[in-house]
Amino acid sequence: MRKKMQTGMHKGQEKVMDGKLRNMAGLYLQQGDRMLLLYRIGSKVVSDSYTASAGGHFEKEELNDARACILRELYEETGLTEHDIVNLTLRYVTVRLKNGELRQNYYFFADLKDGQKEIVSNEGNLEWFHIEKLLKNPPEMPFTAQYVIKHYAEIGKNTDMLYAGIATGTGVAFTEMEEF
């Protein structure tokens, strides 16, 4: 049983009640059975681990437009534009309580068009991974990202659903999102 603070809240909840949010978006680029990951270096939030091909925090004017955020991040970090990719789709939205803030991550997937030049990033080192290798021997990744990749490889890549994930201390619980 979790200990409750004197206020009746669980540890960490007192800051969440202030409404602090961190909205982030990530894009996983694919080509065939390979996925491009970024070994991010020098980030204030996620550093020295593998992350999406491109991603970051929402700008004020993007708060209601995750697609605009990810296209901006894609261009800023790799020089690629929407014309260099196909099938850009929001597939996962995750929520995690971390350091007193709710971290909402919007995970997009897209295919890189054939014939693209070598991709470089100003945020770290890009590396292609076979999706099966990611499952068998995953590199160091942010908490929700590792569960998104696992779910995508096992289930998500075979559907066209949007999934919501709630992070717990032991994993991420995913459910299909439906419009109603």
PLM-predicted stretches and their roles:
Residues 2-53, 82-83:
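N-terminal strand-loop-strand
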Residues 28, 37, 107-109, 128:
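Conserved hydrophobic/aromatic beta-strand scaffold that supports enzyme active sites
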Residues 31-34, 41, 111-116, 131-133:
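Short loop segments at secondary-structure junctions
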Residues 34-75, 172-180:
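Conserved Nudix-box catalytic region and its N-terminal flanking loop in Nudix hydrolases
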Residues 54, 107, 118-153, 175-178:
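NUDIX/MutT-family hydrolases
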Residues 66, 79-116:
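Active-site segment of metal-dependent pyrophosphate-handling enzymes
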Residues 151-180:
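Charged phosphate-binding loop/patch that engages nucleotide di/tri-phosphates or the phosphate backbone
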